[in-house]
Amino acid sequence: MSTIYALSTVFGKSGVAVFRISGPDALRALELLGLDIKQPRPRFVYFARLFDEQLLIDEVLVVYFASPASFTGEDVVELHSHGSIAVLRYISEKLSTLFKPAEPGEFTRRAVLNNRMDLTKAEGIIDIINSETQEQLKQASRHLSGKLAEEYNSLRDKIIKVLSYLEAYIDFPDEEIPETVLAEIQQSIVAIQCDISRYLADGKVGEKIREGFSVVIVGKPNVGKSTLFNYLAKRDLAIVTDIPGTTRDILEVRLDCHGYPVILSDTAGIQETCDAIEKMGITRALKKATEADVIVFLRDITELHLTNVRREDVANSVIERHLDRQVAALGSREHIQIDQRHVDKLIGSSDWAQEMQLNEAGVRSKNMNYPDIEERDLNLRDILDERHEEKDRSVMCHDMMQEHDPDNGECSDDVDRRFNELFTAAKKLEIPVVKVVTKGDIAPTQLSFWQDKGYICISVYKGEGMQLLLDKIFDIISSSNIEAHIITRARHRLALENALEHLRRFNTDLPIELAAEEIKLAANHIASVTGEIKLDDVLDEIFSSFCIGK
């Protein structure tokens, strides 16, 4: 085995840097660097001066770990210097003349090969290094403590016990073995299958804790998706404008939600569009939502909610308040209109609807003190015809008049249909949907309406309702955390699935040798998780994710 070396700390300016040398010739590093340390005692710290001829390069500390009582199971020397770039380069150049630079994870790989740890403990090390939240650290600590290995070894021991009975049948065919033994073997195999099936039915919580729970924000354009995204990210990652369709692609940020890792995604607003790029963004948004662990569905509190309204005066009041808020927010930049056919559909009257729209000229004139706008409003005698001529300057409110709650199957347009399809898919896939209404500070009188419909009301501007939203997301993702989960990687899951498949193939009607082979293969798959059976391709995959020097 060759002797390897690596800088175990970050290359750059720092207070302390640590070099690690492991292998049969590790002690030769002291001579190579000209350090005046003779026959060092294991686990003692030695002070030495590093010279280049007569020039003092640095003052260092040296620790020697003798085989096999070291991290790698080999002789190991650790050299602690100051984190000067010049010093690090000098030491690296010296060590490279005699030793081989370590590959990523090579120190830990040698520890596994020398039986200093199993694969799950090695994975625990890299997970601790990569952990960003408390739950990730707790899960990684279970690996490092050996508890995960205990679970897999216990499962393998049960399979080996069954295999030993079958081997007895094979090795001693002339002996009289009670027929009840085969029945007991069958019962044991069924019990093991139940254990593995239970482990597999964990909702992939272990992988999600390690990689992050996916939380996707969806909604129409300009409902506040990017504003909420930036608020939770605590920095401006998404561009926020009042121009619909600003967000085209998916933006992601990692968050710590009360100890749980969350990957929050901002998506394109769902609307009807002729823009090819925006269409692609909408398609991606809907696809991302169906792959999420939690969907956060946003609506604007200023949306009209005329569903089930049958009184003309109530509907008129709702629309007036809505337009008044919209005009105040938009100023003279936009022209606001109502699509009469949807008012008719909900209210059942056309006479008062058009009259109400004409009366709104006064509301708009009061809020827009600009001569050109005032003149325009006073001539809104044919508001519906003008909508077609000024389509590019209109705020179309008709698509706001129908509720798009997940439990509502009615569709008034293509946008409604796409939302309903999304919520139907989410229900089938058991993806929780958190309903949120934004801009609660604009219309506080309408909060109760939305709260009664199960919405969380927030105001990013005032920071209101944000903790309630985070608590709701936390409740959902934390409820999936099963303390007994033992799968944290895809390779663990694959090993258990393969083992379960071989156990299911076991059949006492088969020749006993073939039946025993299925059990043996099942045991081997379980053993591959901890590394009892070391496969080169498995080792390569695991340690390639390690940093150099670990």
From Swiss-Prot:
Pfam families: MMR_HSR1 (PF01926), MnmE_helical (PF12631), TrmE_N (PF10396). Residues 212-478 form the TrmE-type G domain. The keyword Metal-binding applies. (6S)-5-formyl-5,6,7,8-tetrahydrofolate binds at residues 20, 78, 116, 550. Its EC number is 3.6.-.-. Binds 1 potassium ion per subunit. Its main location: cytoplasm. GO terms for cellular component: cytoplasm. One of its GO terms (biological process) is tRNA methylation. GTP binds at residues 222-227, 241-247, 266-269. Homodimer. Heterotetramer of two MnmE and two MnmG subunits. HAMAP family: GTPase_MnmE. This is tRNA modification GTPase MnmE.
